[in-house]
Regions:
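Hydrophobic alpha-helical signal peptides and transmembrane signal-/tail-anchor segments
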Residues: 1-2
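Short, positively charged and aromatic/hydrophobic N-terminal segments
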Residues: 5, 9-12, 16-18, 22-23
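Long, contiguous binding/interaction regions
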Residues: 26-333
Length: 333
């Protein structure tokens, strides 16, 4: 998915054998982008991230945190075996540190580790990522006592493919949901972990997390726009969207996942949101990308055109990290 020089670039960070040996063995890489329900406590976020940094064979590429959503997202890449270990370690650390009974944030959530997606990176198939997701789900149940739903390509039932359907009810409503006939966890018993809730785990293709901020405090406008553009309501085929209120900024936000950026581009949704916002007499005041984004998705999106807030190509585009690794300028932070 990246480029042929990837083994050479990554071998130092991944603490693997020399690049030539890796090429001979057709090195497999998987990307993992778990979301944790903590975006305010720096010490807790650092402790979770340390579980990845300390795992041989893993490279932690990015940490995104948001106090309003009270959520953080790690992006790391490594061999399937290393990524499995890192995922289980972070889940156990999140179970230790995060208590959802006291969690408040703008973003929907059902677990301390809310979602764990696996994405094929190099010489990995989606089917192999599905198998990995099941191994991780089983271990997180056995070692941390956290049940899980399998979602996206790993889903065992059609209604579990969509993350939003799995998460509906959130932490507070999940005990009752698990008692429904169709909603027993794929791993674990029909009871959430008392403080860490339940996790969604699955394999998927790359997506872009893209948010657009509006100059209004009326969250109903953001929700109306989200309904119009998301696939489930007849909007863009590869767009998932919700409307949120950012209390600390007193503005509304359209928060999106673009699950196939070749099919539904950033520009397409941005322009549609602009047009719909105009109908309400509302302007776009900024946008943001959450986590790492494929460079290809940004080639047609000039920074000034999208009014990106706090965007740093150096920090948020995966290829820049890989270039730094090749030059020896970057290391684990």
């Amino acid at each position: 998915m990246f480029f042929p020089e990837l083994p050479v670039i990554l071998h130092k960070r991944l603490r693997q054998p020399q690049a030539a040996d890796m090429e001979d063995h057709h090195m497999k890489l998987v990307e993992c982008i778990p979301n944790y329900s903590e975006g305010r406590d720096e010490a807790k976020i650092a402790a979770i991230a340390a579980c990845v940094k300390e795992t041989p064979g893993c490279a932690l590429l990015d940490i995104q945190k948001d106090a309003t959503h009270n959520r953080c997202v790690l992006t790391f890449v490594g061999s399937p075996e290393a990524v499995e270990e890192a995922c289980v370690k972070t889940a156990k650390k999140a179970e230790e540190l995060i208590d959802l009974r006291f969690h408040k944030g703008a973003h929907p959530r059902m677990g301390a580790v809310d979602v764990i997606p696996f994405v094929p990176a190099m010489d990995m198939s989606l089917e192999e990522c599905v198998a990995l997701s099941k191994k991780v789900a089983e271990r997180i149940w056995e070692e941390a006592g956290i049940p899980s739903f399998l979602y996206e390509a790993s889903a065992t039932r059609p209604e579990r493919r969509n993350l939003a359907d799995c998460r509906r009810g959130e932490f507070e409503g999940m005990p009752e949901k698990l008692l429904q006939e169709d909603w027993a966890p794929d791993y674990g018993t029909r009871a959430i972990h008392p403080t860490a809730g339940i996790t969604a785990i699955g394999a998927r293709n790359p997506l872009i997390a893209f948010n657009v901020n509006l100059d209004t405090d009326n969250v109903e406008i953001a929700k109306s726009i989200a309904r119009a553009i998301r696939a489930s309501n007849g909007g863009f085929r590869s767009c998932k969207a919700i409307g949120l209120k950012l209390e600390d900024r007193n503005i509304a936000q359209v928060s999106m996942n673009l699950v196939n950026y070749e099919d539904t581009s950033i520009v397409m949704v941005f322009e549609m949101i602009r047009a719909l916002a105009d109908r309400f007499g509302v302007r776009i005041i900024g946008s943001e990308l959450v986590g790492l984004t494929p460079a290809k998705a940004l080639l047609d999106c000039a920074e000034y055109y999208l009014k990106l807030e706090n965007f740093s190509a150096k920090q948020q585009v995966m290829e820049y990290h890989l270039i730094d690794l090749e030059s020896g300028d970057a290391g684990n932070e």
